[in-house]
Amino acid sequence: FWQMGGVGPMAGQVHHFRNYAVETLTYAINRYINEVNRLYGVMNLRLKDRPFIAGKYSIADMALVGWVNGWERQGQDINEFPNLKRWLETMKARPAVKRGMALGLELRQGIDMKDPKVQAVLFNQRARTG
């Protein structure tokens, strides 16, 4: 599934290197910003003549909306992708999407991703054996 092998991993990497990493790695930031931009272009073309990714509303739209909604934190300009922007606005207007995006919002607000205690939970953990 395209979201699982493309948009999710690439957007996740740009979020990591752009917003959470303890050191600035310009090459990594630019690489993933550009790859997400390319993937947004693919979605924009796909949405040129249809309201949803697969034509009708489907799990494909549900899986992608959370990632595309983070366009600003991914270093993207949604206005470069008018079909994708229309799709995102349509998705965000759906009652079920609104409810889903509201879940846990209070838990996500105010978290400092640069706080060493937060980063200790997120990074440099290894599997323990034995």
Which role does the model predict for each range below?
Residues L105-G130:
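Acidic/histidine-enriched, glycine/proline-rich intrinsically disordered or flexible terminal extensions
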